[in-house]
């Protein structure tokens, strides 16, 4: 199904061609002056230079051939050469009916199906999720869902940090606390216990204690470094403890990500890439791609046209150790072998841009991926407190993500209880859904690369561009539709008819943008575009709701059209919030 912009453009193109002008000038956009018109074409301005004519003459010529076109209720030329367009209400109603009957409301991605790896989450084993993990999780989940909606085979990978020094620190701290465990008995030859020697709460306390100790105790730090090397070299006891750490940590991380409505297809980590590293680096050396510099093994990534000097990618340190770049490159080797992706999308703090530039260029230069491989980095900004600095607890520490969620749930709960008469249990359940929407929408409504201020009072408000406002709009529509069916009405086979007043047409005009918005969000990895759209639709619906008595409309044909229109509105809003991984309660 073509978008409304494409359909209007087709009509304008035909006339530009008929008048002897290149159809490329017939570009139509949504009007940036909705007080003047609904759509516009500024092509006559550009065509004037090519054809050495006054732009208004070209615009007049085109408009003259379109005045009787049934697609338009008004089309006019405005000096110096703009073409202003309003769409016919009957045509608009027909388009909306086709949307409601078409899969994905008419959205269609013309590209062939791709296999897309979305690398997001960024969690570390043995560490709790904190507020710094929020953006990668919620933006990544939305990008993954948008890609799936676009028809791609999408694979989301949490890519755990599970192979670094934190493992050695935990192993040695555990040795100091529980030296009697068989892992620390050099003469032990039996099977190690299946039960982990710690709980998740103990594990989360062990790591920071060990990290602090390593800063003050050089001998302990050296032991931790040695334990890390032993783990990475395959030591049986260290590997057994590591497996316990991973089992306990993954279970807790899955629970916390589930609470965020974030779900991964793969739970792989840096450890999975380790078997590929030596072969990969040695091949780079043999192929003349990598060379030794100051004891380290590096790959030059500078390219002609770069406006600044870029440092080489270090793939092996002077002591033989691998780095994050090495692990990320080896992960690409594994992904190429197992999944054959067409596209890679990585989500991380925008300050990691150089790192991913190095990794992508090295992967292409070394032949790990094709030279024209589609590799994208979506860098996000920081979630800040009201002081404009990275969000902290009141005591200045890093806040755990589950505590942040609890805080916003409580804020929403208090608003529900103060404004409505509702049972506490229902209020708590509703607050959990709405609170998560407040948190996620507050993040996703910002362009990913921008920093934003976390304001619990604003995010939890039921007014303005917020998650609760969007959900309240959907719940309001659900309530109207429920009352309609309870009174004997049926929503089956209802048709939208031509709008008869402004707010009705405004809602219709907002809904027809759906396919264009989804296409833009998909191509730009930009969930905030969906947020902008659903806020516009919600405002348009509420304007329509306040201007019209939907259920008490005496004209039955008009009432049926209203019900069909708001049913489509609800369906589109629900589809959009699902792409943001936001759920909606039945009542609020």
What are these regions (language model features)?
Residues 1-93, 105, 110-588:
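Non-catalytic interaction-recognition regions
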């Amino acid at each position: 199904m073509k978008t409304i912009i494409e359909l209007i453009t087709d009509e304008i193109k035909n006339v530009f061609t008929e008048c002897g002008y290149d159809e490329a000038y017939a570009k139509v956009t949504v009007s940036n002056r909705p007080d003047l018109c609904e759509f516009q074409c500024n092509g006559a301005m550009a065509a004037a230079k090519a054809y050495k004519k006054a732009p208004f003459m070209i615009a007049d010529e085109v408009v003259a051939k379109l005045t009787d076109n049934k697609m338009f209720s008004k089309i006019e030329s405005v000096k110096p050469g703009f073409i202003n367009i309003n769409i016919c209400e009957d045509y608009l109603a027909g388009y909306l009916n086709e949307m409601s009957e078409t899969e994905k409301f008419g959205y269609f991605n013309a590209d062939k199906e791709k296999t897309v790896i979305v690398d997001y989450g960024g969690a570390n084993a043995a560490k709790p999720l904190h507020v710094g993990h929020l953006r990668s999780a919620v933006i990544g989940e939305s990008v993954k869902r948008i890609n799936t909606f676009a028809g791609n085979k999408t694979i989301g990978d949490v890519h755990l940090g599970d192979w670094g020094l934190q493992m050695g620190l935990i192993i040695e701290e555990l040795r100091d606390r529980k030296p009697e465990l068989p892992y620390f008995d050099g003469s032990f030859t039996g099977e190690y216990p299946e039960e982990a020697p710690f709980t998740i709460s103990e594990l989360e306390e062990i790591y920071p204690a060990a990290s602090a100790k390593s800063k003050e105790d050089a001998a302990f730090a050296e032991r931790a470094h040695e334990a890390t090397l032993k783990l990475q070299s395959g030591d049986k006891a260290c590997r057994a403890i590591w497996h316990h750490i991973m089992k306990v940590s993954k279970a807790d991380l899955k629970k916390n990500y589930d609470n965020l409505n974030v779900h991964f297809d793969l739970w792989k980590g840096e450890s999975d890439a380790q078997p590929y590293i030596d072969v990969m680096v040695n091949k780079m050396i043999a192929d003349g791609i990598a060379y030794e510099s100051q004891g380290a093994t590096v790959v030059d990534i500078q390219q002609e046209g770069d406006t600044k000097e870029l440092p080489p990618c270090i793939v092996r340190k002077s002591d033989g150790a691998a780095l994050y770049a090495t692990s990320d490159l080896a992960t690409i080797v594994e992904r190429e072998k197992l999944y054959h992706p067409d596209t890679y999308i990585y989500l991380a703090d925008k300050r990691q841009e150089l790192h991913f530039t190095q990794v992508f260029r090295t992967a292409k230069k070394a032949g790990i991926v094709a030279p024209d491989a589609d590799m994208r980095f979506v860098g996000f900004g920081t979630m800040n407190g009201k002081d404009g600095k990275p969000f902290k607890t009141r005591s200045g520490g890093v806040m755990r993500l589950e505590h942040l969620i609890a805080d916003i749930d409580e804020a929403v709960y208090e608003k529900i209880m103060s404004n409505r008469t509702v049972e506490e249990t229902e209020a708590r359940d509703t607050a959990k859904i709405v609170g998560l929407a407040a948190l996620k929408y507050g993040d996703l409504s910002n362009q990913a690369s921008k920093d934003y201020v976390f304001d619990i009072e604003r995010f939890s408000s039921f007014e303005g561009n917020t998650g609760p406002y969007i959900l309240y709009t959907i719940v309001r529509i659900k309530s109207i539709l429920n009352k309609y069916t309870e009174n004997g009405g049926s929503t089956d086979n209802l048709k939208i008819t031509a709008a008869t007043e402004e707010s009705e047409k405004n809602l219709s005009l907002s809904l027809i943008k759906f396919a264009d918005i989804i296409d833009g969000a998909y191509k730009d990895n930009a969930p905030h575009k969906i947020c902008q759209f659903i806020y516009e639709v919600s405002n348009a619906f509420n304007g329509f709701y306040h201007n019209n008595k939907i259920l008490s409309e005496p004209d039955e044909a008009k009432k049926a059209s209203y019900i069909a229109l708001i049913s489509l509105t609800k369906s589109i809003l629900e589809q959009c919030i699902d792409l943001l991984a936001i759920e909606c309660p039945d009542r609020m």
